[in-house]
């Protein structure tokens, strides 16, 4: 069921790209975002992990001054507590952002697949990551809730903050 949902979400993004026949990438409409995240595990993940740190990598295309889409990836490392091992999530997702103004509030989210590392008998599952934050030309600071609905009824959830720097294409 999760894989079917993922396919539906990916196909829903395809009409946006199909309608743009003369897409031109410029420093004003496309860039890379690279940054760090820090969070606290919630739900079942809080039983086996005390906190997490991660990398956030994104490629963004701005359709107009308010709407952006792109590809998101990175790595979230969960530090095990007590006798539990560390583990991680590597997302591969599409993302959407709505910017209210050129500098200020934004909201958005990622939807894709989260690959799990160092967890036996579980490859991963549906990955969602809604966000709300502040942005300017160079920086994004945001709060997020991240959930990977993995196989065998394992949900890996955390809440946290992140910061990314915009690397413009020239």
Describe the predicted segments one by one:
Residues 1-24:
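Bacterial Sec-dependent N-terminal signal peptides
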Residues 18-61, 166-170:
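Short glycine/proline- and aromatic-enriched beta-strand/turn motifs that initiate or cap beta-hairpins
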Residues 27-31, 62-66, 100-104, 134-139, ...:
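Strand-connecting loop/turn motifs
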Residues 28-32, 49-53, 86-92, 122-128, ...:
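Residues that define the transmembrane beta-barrel architecture of outer-membrane proteins
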Residues 33, 37, 106, 136-138, ...:
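Outer-membrane beta-barrel "beta-signal"
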Residues 38-44, 53, 73-79, 100-102, ...:
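Transmembrane beta-strands of outer-membrane beta-barrel pores
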Residues 40-99:
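Glycine- and aromatic-enriched membrane insertion/assembly motifs of diderm outer-membrane
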Residues 58-60, 97-99, 131-135, 164-166:
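Transmembrane beta-barrel domains of outer membrane proteins
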């Amino acid at each position: 069921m999760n894989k079917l949902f993922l396919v539906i979400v990916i196909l829903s993004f395809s009409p946006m790209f199909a309608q743009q026949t003369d897409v031109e990438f410029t420093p004003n409409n496309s860039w890379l975002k690279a940054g760090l995240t820090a969070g606290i595990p919630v739900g079942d993940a809080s039983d086996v992990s005390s906190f997490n740190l991660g990398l956030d990598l994104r490629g963004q295309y701005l359709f107009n001054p308010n709407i952006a889409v792109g590809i998101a990836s990175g790595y979230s490392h969960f530090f095990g507590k007590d006798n539990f091992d560390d583990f991680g999530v590597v997302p591969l997702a599409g993302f959407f952002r709505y910017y209210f103004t050129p500098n200020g509030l934004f909201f958005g989210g990622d939807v894709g697949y989260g690959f799990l590392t160092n967890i036996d008998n579980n490859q991963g599952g549906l990955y969602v990551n809604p966000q709300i934050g502040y942005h300017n030309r160079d920086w994004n600071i945001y709060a997020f809730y991240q959930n990977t609905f993995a196989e065998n009824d394992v949900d890996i959830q955390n809440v946290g903050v992140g910061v990314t720097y915009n690397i413009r294409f020239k």
